[in-house]
């Protein structure tokens, strides 16, 4: 058995999708489903087909009814024996009414329906083979071709259409009645003739209405479709006075103008009243300012400082406004720039730290005797002394002579340099400022002094003091002398005693004042 052709597939699905229940998705009800579940023989939309794919092919096998062309006859039979209607009725019969996809297709009803579709499709495949249609397949009746609707006929009432049809039938009788009427008019000599009563012999009511209509409008049946124009609902105006209508319209316009004018007047009155209230508030505020003697710049300053009286709720006034003065900020005095040193940080640090021990004993002992003064003055003096001690560093003059650059007086700008170096191609700063001769003299003096030595060092060349080895430091060179340490300890003891006395006095005064 070969596979069905693409044309066979399209033909089968065209007829299956013509069934009304197959025009919507089986799960969500979306229109025009283009996917199908072969396992259940139902039509699905693209969103629900994705949910079925996540279930797995053992529960639902999905294919497209438009894109896939490799359908087998067994799969087509599954779709023919199934359908949305049969699947929905089967699920309802077995009590499965949930909308959850996992719960629905993992239920007992879904398992039974899968087995049923599989058995029916197998039987249909064996019985019909490659036939397109099955005996049990429901074929929808072919709908008649749509007729072209007449615009006028759709807007005409059924009664009028029936009368028009009856008028076309009764036209010969009306034509035969006309010669009788003309002969009667000739015989009676111009007397008025009433309507014809020959139509009363007709037993039906419709023909009576037709005869009356024909008398009023004898040309209606001849005009065909044009005769129906009078039945669109238009009515002829009778006994209408246009002057009265015009007067009513003018009266309505006048009423509208009066209402608009009243609205404008009321709006202007509200604006005027609000302005009056604003002026009253302003006058009250000005009177308050006059009472408080605030005017000009003081008023602005008081508002800026948060002492304005316009936003205050209380009537209490501040006395600060009477003595308010404007303080103008003077230009700040620039602080003197600190000295910048390019010295060695290590040398300056150790020199400044050791300056305390280099001071005489009298100066150090005098610091401890200052406890007899008042506490405030003592702390100020001690703070200033400590600051001076810490900030005291070696200046430019404390550097050794060998490492210090010599100070030279600037050479006056004269013509001597031009005369001296006029023909020289290149000169140095030492040659220009006259430092070359002095440097040469110092170098020659050092070399003559060290000429007898077998080896020299940089310290010998630049006449720097030699550094002691790390192992040659003694305790006496590091620590101060013994008398100094004794005096230092004695000063510390005296300071500690005075501190304890001072602390006891403070605690006693606090207890006396606030209570223990």
Curated annotation (Swiss-Prot):
Sequence positions bearing Phosphoserine: 231, 270, 274, 331, 370, 428, 451, 453, 455, 457-458
Tissue specificity annotation: Widely expressed. Highest expression in endocrine glands (pancreas, pituitary gland, salivary gland, and prostate) and testis with a much higher expression in the testis than in the ovary.
Lipid bilayer topology: Peripheral membrane protein
SMART domains (UniProt xref): ArfGap (SM00105)
Segments of skewed composition (Polar residues): 173-194
Cellular location(s): Cytoplasm; Golgi apparatus membrane
GO biological process, one term: intracellular protein transport
UniProt GO MF annotations: GTPase activator activity; zinc ion binding
Coiled-coil residue spans: 243-263
A Gene Ontology cellular-component term: cytosol
Description of how activity is regulated: GAP activity stimulated by phosphatidylinositol 4,5-bisphosphate (PIP2).
Region (Disordered): 170-199, 322-346, 390-414
Residues covered by the Arf-GAP domain: 10-126
Pfam families from the UniProt entry: ArfGap
Entry-linked InterPro entries: ARFGAP/RecO, ArfGAP_dom, ArfGAP_dom_sf
Keywords: Coiled coil, Cytoplasm, ER-Golgi transport, Golgi apparatus, GTPase activation, Membrane, Metal-binding, Phosphoprotein, Protein transport, Transport, Zinc, Zinc-finger
ZnF (C4-type) intervals: 25-48
Impact after mutating residue 290 to G: In a breast cancer sample; somatic mutation
Function: GTPase-activating protein (GAP) for ADP ribosylation factor 1 (ARF1). Hydrolysis of ARF1-bound GTP may lead to dissociation of coatomer from Golgi-derived membranes to allow fusion with target membranes.
Protein name: ADP-ribosylation factor GTPase-activating protein 3
Lineage: Eukaryota, Metazoa, Chordata, Craniata, Vertebrata
Record gene name: ARFGAP3
